[in-house]
């Protein structure tokens, strides 16, 4: 179970990105975080796995406090958090197979990881997952040869091979066309359900959130203004979430202020 308690993030500029955010994600539920650009959605997801350091508050994964860990212990807990990025976060010059197997770096020594020497069982599992996400036969293609939808499927495969306790997903459809977006969401929720892994999903498109999530968390100005079922998300609550009028709750997606992807492989 993921537990977030009173999380707060204030940037050096003084901007408050998160203000007393608390939530839990458990079982095999899919929880979608919605809100306008700048509401703190990406910051929340990245604070959970410490890609962004929170100012205060705590994050727990099962009985382990993530926020209290020293840097050298972070690889072990990140291994339990499958992260799927908005901009894919693939190593462009590496093959599809090599990118997927990077999800196993937390399970091998630094030397083996550097030489990309993985146990045969990991390789076999990677082939199985690639077939599952519809990329069979592309394992030797470089990542920079793939379409956006294919790249996101590689990201999903990499997260799944980690055998995570939770999947953290940051705007998985923002760079995709509507049809590909639905294909990716179908795949993501199907695999998460089959694996019995909960999903915390930051997503801009409210329609997709309502269709695919079990629960909605609405953020506005860094605070939770709604946490409940998809059925309970009515027009009044949407207006409360998007009250600043910066964008329509069900408009086409626009990018949240940039948070640079960490392109290092986290072990």
From Swiss-Prot:
**CDD domains found in the cross-reference section:** ABC_PhnC_transporter
* Gene3D superfamilies, A to Z: P-loop containing nucleotide triphosphate hydrolases (3.40.50.300)
Which SMART domains would you find in this protein's record?
A: AAA
UniProt-listed Pfam families = ABC_tran (PF00005)
> Which membrane topology describes this protein?
Peripheral membrane protein
Task: Report the catalytic activity.
Answer: phosphonate(out) + ATP + H2O = phosphonate(in) + ADP + phosphate + H(+)
Protein role: Part of the ABC transporter complex PhnCDE involved in phosphonates import. Responsible for energy coupling to the transport system.
Q: What is this protein called?
A: Phosphonates import ATP-binding protein PhnC 2
């Amino acid at each position: 179970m993921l537990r977030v308690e009173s999380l707060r993030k204030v940037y050096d500029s003084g901007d408050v990105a998160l203000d007393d955010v608390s939530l839990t994600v458990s079982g095999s539920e899919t929880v979608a975080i919605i809100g306008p650009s700048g509401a703190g959605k990406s910051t929340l997801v990245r604070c959970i796995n410490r890609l962004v350091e929170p100012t205060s508050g705590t994050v727990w994964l099962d009985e382990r406090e993530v926020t209290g860990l020293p840097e050298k212990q972070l690889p072990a807990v990140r291994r339990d958090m499958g992260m799927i990025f908005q901009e894919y976060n693939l190593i462009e010059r590496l093959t599809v197979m090599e990118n997927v197997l990077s999800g196993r770096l937390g399970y091998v020594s630094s030397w083996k990881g550097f030489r990309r020497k993985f146990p045969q069982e990991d390789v076999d599992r990677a082939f199985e997952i690639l077939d599952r996400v519809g990329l069979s036969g592309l394992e030797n293609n470089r990542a920079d040869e793939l379409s956006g939808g294919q790249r996101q499927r590689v990201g999903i495969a990499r997260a799944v091979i980690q055998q995570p306790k939770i999947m953290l997903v940051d705007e998985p459809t923002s760079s995709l066309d509507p049809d590909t977006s639905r294909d990716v969401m179908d795949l993501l929720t199907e695999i998460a359900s089959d694996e019995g892994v909960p999903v915390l999903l930051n997503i801009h498109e409210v329609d997709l959130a309502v269709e695919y999530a079990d629960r909605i968390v609405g953020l506005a100005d860094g605070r939770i203004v709604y946490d409940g079922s998809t059925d309970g998300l009515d027009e009044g609550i949407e207006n409360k979430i998007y009250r600043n009028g910066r964008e329509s709750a069900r408009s086409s997606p626009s990018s949240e202020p940039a948070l640079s992807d960490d392109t290092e492989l986290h072990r």
